[in-house]
């Protein structure tokens, strides 16, 4: 019965599929919200109403894209599908908890949408800073609903993280060491450790905000001896690792895609890649205050956070050059996933360079809360995380469905999307350097040109997203079956055929390890 299969599933492949479908649906909502933002900003003057409704849309766009699109797709979707197949496990360590992790997300999403639907909505930005998020500036239940939504999404992620960590450490064949697992498995391991360490801090911060709003505590209210800066420290101690949580699984997927389409049996510098991911994970926890350069920190504190932030560029550079070295000398197959991966490498590097600019506290004081930061963030996320999702989706779609996507149309869709996102976000660097602040629904006429260009870019991206839906429909409609897979011995997820049987590795895999070191 369909209800038993999908509602009560304990199968990692089915739960992965549920995550992918949920993430795609949330992605449509998040895209719609982003188009409302760009429609409002396409011309000077007001379109949708006041700043409150505009900021509700901005806040919802951020939460939907982060918690209900990127994380469910990368960690829940690709993680569930691929990790057990890549390590030879019959399923996840805790299959029923896996099911609960997924089913906590739709109620969480519902609470977030409800927060926008009651009173005036939560127009706080995704950071939910008090006193704007307090009960004076945001009377009513909107912010409370947002907090409960975040609680549920957080519990979901923590449970999934426990599940992945246990699975990856305990469910490998005995002969396989951790340093022989694929890089995607490593990326999920590092990501889930980051989630496990950072989410409880967010939970503490938003719970304190909840009691400040409803129970008259004063954690963040100077009138009772509290400090709103404490909230910023708690939030960003989660918020900075979060952006690495969003990109690390993408790093893992890009490593697989680049190696596969370069015709290599493994990525260049495997150990360097692993240690780089662990270094990024560690450093991600000790740089949070670079989001707070404008709150009046000591000069030595600012110096520390500036240098610590710049250090993250080193392991990131190790990864970028290892991807390029993997491509070097390969028999390159110019298929769509590789195009997405190459776009990722180039544009993520551009985003990383603007990150180096923002790491300088003196420069950041000028650029903070301008569109320069928006441009930086969207270069590393839209053109990092989303490009990685696209590369991984097109690469593994035949594995998950048994059908192949139309290669020419996916290439056209890549070109459209590439033009769209660059046209959307590149001009925002100019707006930021010219001093246009974020989170305002209107602007002086001087900023009109680049805002118009940016909004046109967003419409091109929309066409590309709609085209992707058509391409997926076309694949299921035409039913072109997979013919052959190259190098299934080094890409073990393909070993069982496309799609793999409902249950794989029912007997423990026999692994004979050849040690080359």
UniProtKB/Swiss-Prot annotation:
What Gene3D superfamilies does the annotation carry? Cytochrome c oxidase-like, subunit I domain (1.20.210.10)
Mitochondrial intermembrane topological intervals:
41-50, 118-140, 213-227, 287-298, 358-370, 434-446
GO terms, molecular function: cytochrome-c oxidase activity; heme binding; metal ion binding
Q: Which Pfam family would be a valid example here?
A: COX1
Q: What kind of membrane protein is this, topologically?
A: Multi-pass membrane protein
Which GO biological-process labels does this protein carry?
electron transport coupled proton transport; mitochondrial electron transport, cytochrome c to oxygen
Cross-link 1'-histidyl-3'-tyrosine (His-Tyr) mapped to chain:
240-244
Tell me the protein's name: Cytochrome c oxidase subunit 1
Which pathway, metabolic or otherwise, does it act in?
A: Energy metabolism; oxidative phosphorylation
Organism of provenance: Scyliorhinus canicula (Small-spotted catshark)
From which domain of life does this come? Eukaryota
